[in-house]
Each structure stands twice: as C-alpha cells, then as structure tokens.
Amino acid sequence: MSRMTLKSSMKKRVLSLLIAVVFLSLTGVFPSGLIETKVSAAKITENYQFDSRIRLNSIGFIPNHSKKATIAANCSTFYVVKEDGTIVYTGTATSMFDNDTKETVYIADFSSVNEEGTYYLAVPGVGKSVNFKIAMNVYEDAFKTAMLGMYLLRCGTSVSATYNGIHYSHGPCHTNDAYLDYINGQHTKKDSTKGWHDAGDYNKYVVNAGITVGSMFLAWEHFKDQLEPVALEIPEKNNSIPDFLDELKYEIDWILTMQYPDGSGRVAHKVSTRNFGGFIMPENEHDERFFVPWSSAATADFVAMTAMAARIFRPYDPQYAEKCINAAKVSYEFLKNNPANVFANQSGFSTGEYATVSDADDRLWAAAEMWETLGDEEYLRDFENRAAQFSKKIEADFDWDNVANLGMFTYLLSERPGKNPALVQSIKDSLLSTADSIVRTSQNHGYGRTLGTTYYWGCNGTVVRQTMILQVANKISPNNDYVNAALDAISHVFGRNYYNRSYVTGLGINPPMNPHDRRSGADGIWEPWPGYLVGGGWPGPKDWVDIQDSYQTNEIAINWNAALIYALAGFVNYNSAQNEVLYGDVNDDGKVNSTDLTLLKRYVLKAVSTLPSSKAEKNADVNRDGRVNSSDVTILSRYLIRVIEKLPI
C-alpha cells in the first residue's frame, strides 16, 4: 500500500470513529460522566410534551454554577435543548432514593452548560421541562418582585402597582394607629403609622420585624455594591437614598414609634386589633388598634434594628441616623438596668403572640449592633460575655425566635479592632461546620433542599434564610460549594420540589394562586398579590395545600420574604460581583485552600511561568503591594492555618 493510500485510509477510519462517538453519545450509550457532548448542529426531532415530573428552577440558572433538575420518573438520557430545538448537551441522569419524599428520583446535572439563553430539558420516555434561562442577571426580576411585595405591604398609606398587566392597589389604611389603653390606661392615641403589615393579617409586630429588618440590612451590608444601583418602583425612587434603603426606612419609621412615650426606653410588643380581622381590604378594617405592652425581646430587637439603621443611613441622612442611634441608646440602657426576660402581657389579644422562650439571643444581637455602630468597649464586652454562654455559636435553623446568628455574623465580619481571638475562632469554626452540614444536606436531598427533612410552619422561609449562613461562610472561607448550596435553596422554592411549582406568588412555574393573604382574598382579582413566598409543606413535603384557609402552609409573612430577598440579593448584579478579587484564590477556582498555596509556591519558585488568568494574578497578591513573591506565600500559608483572620492584609 502506498504512503498516500495509507494516509487516506487513516483519515477515513478517524472520521468514522468520530461519527460513531457522536452517534453513541447522542443516543445515551456513553454515560455523561465519560462523554459530555455539546452538539451545536443536532436538533430535537421528537415532539416532547411538558411533563411535571421534570422538576427544576423555573426562574433559571447562573453561568458557571450548579444546574440540576430532579426527574420523578425512570429515565437515563436527557438533553439540554435551546428554544429553537438545538441540542447543546447530552447527559445521563443518576438515580437516588429521596428519604424525604420516599421516592426514587433521577438527578440531571447540566452544570457545564453556561452559554446564556433560554432552554428546556428533554427526557426520552418522559417529556420536557418548563423553559428556563441561563443568564448572569437571571434573578434581577425575581428580586425586584420580592421587593415589590414589601412595598405592597405598606401600612398607613395607599399603595399602587401594576404587575404583569394587572393593577393592584388599596387606599390609605390604619391611619389611626394606635391607642394607648394597654400602656397607660387612657384611651388616647400616639402616632404609630407606617411600617409593613406583618403577614396574612394587617397587624404589626416588633419581634417579627427584628428578623425581617435584620436580614434585609445584612443583605445591604453583604451585597451593597450589587444592591445600590437597583431601581425599584416606589414613591421615593427619585430621592438621594438608594431605593432598597428607602423601603427599609418605611419600616424603621414605624419601629421608632414603638418606644413608650414615658421615655423609659421600653418598647411595645406590637400594634394590633384585639382579634384577627376578616378577609377585607386594609382600608376597610376599622377596628381599633392598640399598643400592646412591652417585652424585653421587642426592646432588644428595637435596639438592634435602630443601631443598624444608624450606621447604614449615616452616609445618606445623618440627622435620621442620629435619631436612630439616640433611640437605641435609651432602650439599651433600659435593658442593662432590667436584665429579666419579660414577656408581653397580651391578655385581651388573640393575634400573633411572637413570644420567645428567652431574650438572650435578642440581647446578644443588640449588643453586637451597638458595638459595630459605635465601637464602645461596653458593647463589645457585653456581646462577648453573652456569646460565651452559647454552646453552639451558629444555628442551622433560625427565625424570629432565635436571632443570635445575626449578632454572630456582625461580630465575625466586623473590621473593628479588639475582638477576642478565641471567640472569633469559635464562631468561625461553628459557622463553617454548620455551612458544611447544610451543603451535605442539600447534596443528599433529592430536591436539593438545604433544610433536609425538617418541616414546620413557614419552613420555606428557613430554606432561603440558610443562604445567610452559606454566604457568610463563603466570605470567611471562599468555597463554591457554599454558593451552589445557596443556589440550591433558591432553586427549591422556584420549582425544584415535589410539586414542580414555584412557592412565590407571581413568579415561576404554576405559582401559588390562593395564599392566606387578606388582600388577595378580598380584592376581587383572580391573581394574588405578587412577590410573596408562602410557608410550604407541613408536617411533611407532600402537605402543602394551595388554598386560602391553609394558613399553616400557604400564608405569607414579612420574615419569610426578607429571607427570600437576602437569598436573591447575593445574585443581583452578579456579573459585577464575579469580577471582584478573591484574594488567595491563586488557581481561580472560586476557593481558597492548600491547592492555591502549592500553586503560589511553584509560581514564586518559577516552576510554573504563569497563573491561570489575569484575575488569578490579582488574587495572588494577598498583601496588595503590586507584586507576587515570597511575602504572599507566607501570608497565604498563615491564613490557611488561621493565624491570619482574613485576606487581604
């Protein structure tokens, strides 16, 4: 055989082999773990019909992060398909038994698909999923809708908004808030307008405002650069304060009215009617509303909220900031002189109690925020003494009745000097251990649920609130597993769940239509008011009921919505966030660990001539002196063994 004939024969054999590989991968003969095919020319030829057993995040996914679907049907091959029918990825689903829903499910992992666009999953023998997007800004609209939900909860004023072509509005409500009968025995009134209606009812509760405001203020402090430019459709949108903070200010304005008029610093527990009202519009509720006597938990939460408001509003409105911190000081002094846990006397009221077993967590949070705002030694010692009494520093499951995590986060992330190194290490260890546990729980759950098999009234709020733990852990010890678990929590409430339904009104696939919300039940409009996370299944994953009367599973609440807002805030304007320097991430994989130290040593010793990217070069300069050398190696090694608390130095 001639040399030319031999070359021609080899070309034909290689071409035949390539054709065979493509054919076999498209038909699912090769497992996706062995061959992951990105086929730009192949088109879907079968007419796939929507099947609700293919369950995924109907809002969409962010490039370069986890993307998973759960398929509750026997299957193997799946395709990721563009809107025009082009197959961009072929994979093999892996089976697992979900101990939560007690079913065998199949996990389709298509995390390597990162091109922005609109797609669906096609599963031979099953059907296709709802369309979803992959985009850096995929959560922008969801975030704005959740914030719209907060605006529409405003009390003491009229509200008006159009969403998806439907107009939602109500007239001025509860303008007589509130009477002092239960405070001083006189039927006189003290102004307590503004604030948000709490949940499905129209009352206002300080303790639940605590976790709500705390979560949203932390969202601002953790993601300020991402949130500051976000424009919201609110009446104050053209003033000099960022819109996100304008919405919070409306709540703080009400919070400031809750101090007793006698100047003692005590804070009323709630403003409420004696009994829950009917399903009528807020402007039609005319029952008298009263200040309910003080509690130590409400007073401590007041201190924390107003202290946070003082430092956050200081750059935008110094006079308002001064008003907030002065109020906080008065109530803090009262608490210092009155250490007993005092429950509110709520006799005569059948509305939400928000009675905490202990106020230790509330007082700890108050001390943390006072110290972070003012820097006084007194507040630091108060916090550290209280924190030492908590055997577990970070709890995986927390809400209005346990706000200690909020104080721990503030202390841990504070850049103020003087912190106790041993306490810092203890909190950090607890944080990372808890975050790692949440990651494992999500990875071992058939629907990526970060709360695992735990269910109770409002548990959906906790699912998204756990993103706070994951995001703070990621700030302390960068790890893409934390980010992906946070995204799993979001995915769960937007459709990757047993029902293949979004749990947020007005968003995603087949969202709730009948929430336990008086406005939605009374306004005569078919669609519910938008932007609200409902409570979710209880007592188990199959017990959610989308009916108005099911307050146990289908109510809305400001604390759950604030948790959703925090979760989404971490991924708003995410493109700009991704461009931030992650000091110590020398291999540019989104983590800082011993692998980075090894690469940095090799680079400094010239065993390798380049780092993976220009961003990696910036990440390697951990002392920010404009050079990458042995000093950076020393600093990074000290950081990894926790001699140095944070990077850069």
UniProtKB/Swiss-Prot annotation:
Cofactor(s) for this UniProt protein: Ca(2+)
Tree of life domain: Bacteria
Entries under Gene3D superfamilies matching the protein: 1.50.10.10, Dockerin domain (1.10.1330.10), Immunoglobulins (2.60.40.10)
Keyword Transferase: no
The protein's Enzyme Commission number: 3.2.1.4
GO biological process, one term: cellulose catabolic process
Pfam families linked to this entry: CelD_N, Dockerin_1, Glyco_hydro_9
SUPFAM superfamilies to which the protein is assigned, alphabetical: E set domains, Six-hairpin glycosidases, Type I dockerin domain
Record-annotated Dockerin domain positions: 579-649
Signal peptide span: 1-41
GO molecular function: cellulase activity
Keyword set, alphabetical order: Calcium, Carbohydrate metabolism, Cellulose degradation, Glycosidase, Hydrolase, Polysaccharide degradation, Signal
Function: This enzyme catalyzes the endohydrolysis of 1,4-beta-glucosidic linkages in cellulose, lichenin and cereal beta-D-glucans.
Family, similarity comment: Belongs to the glycosyl hydrolase 9 (cellulase E) family.
Name by which UniProt lists this protein: Endoglucanase D
Source organism per UniProt: Acetivibrio thermocellus (strain ATCC 27405 / DSM 1237 / JCM 9322 / NBRC 103400 / NCIMB 10682 / NRRL B-4536 / VPI 7372)
Gene expressing this chain: celD
